Amino acid sequence: ADGSLSGFYKESMKGKYGYVVSKQSLILTEPIYEDDEITLTTEIGHYSNVIFPRFYYIEKEGRRIGECRSIWTLIDLKRRRITSPKRAGLTLPDNPDLVKEEPETLFTQDDRQLVSTYTVPYSDIDTNRHLNNTHYLRIASNLIPVEAYENHFMDSISINYKKEILAHQIIELYLTHIDDTYIIEGDVEGENCFIVKIHMKEYTK
């Protein structure tokens, strides 16, 4: 609904074209607990023909406690390739002036260690027929030792999605641990498909 109102989506695109997130970074100044009441707002950044930034803000008790920066691209769902708004039949609205820091770009680590594998079940895929974005953080966070979560929370999360992962594919999971930072990489058949970087910060309840 939001995409239609802002001019970035229309019903004729259904099943033909869709947006996928390529990079995102989340910064939190404090943890969010179960039953916390939070408010989410969003705004669109200055876009190009193929890159569409979007920013999200998290407020709790009238205080801004978090911000998410994301980059989206429009793809042809049948060809599985990036496409232009014009090809999708879109006439985009006036380009906003908002320019902010982009999500962090992550790179493969030389000293990464293979720690596990994960076979993607059917229940993990979305309507685009690839591993749903919500599962990447779950898969990555499960590789962090339980002890790391004691008196710590994730205050910084960055994810780079490099190549789609399909149902039943086997992901080789690599971990690099540097102080309070954990970098998790997922490879399929020797090709890097995603990188997740998580920083843990100490807190007291």
Model-derived regions: residue spans:
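Short, positively charged
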Residues: K16-Y17, D35-E37, R54-F55, E150, ...
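Extracellular/lumenal ectodomain signal focusing on beta-strand-rich modules
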Residues: K23, T117, S156-S158
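A conserved, well-ordered hydrophobic junction motif at loop->secondary-structure transitions
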Residues: V120-N142
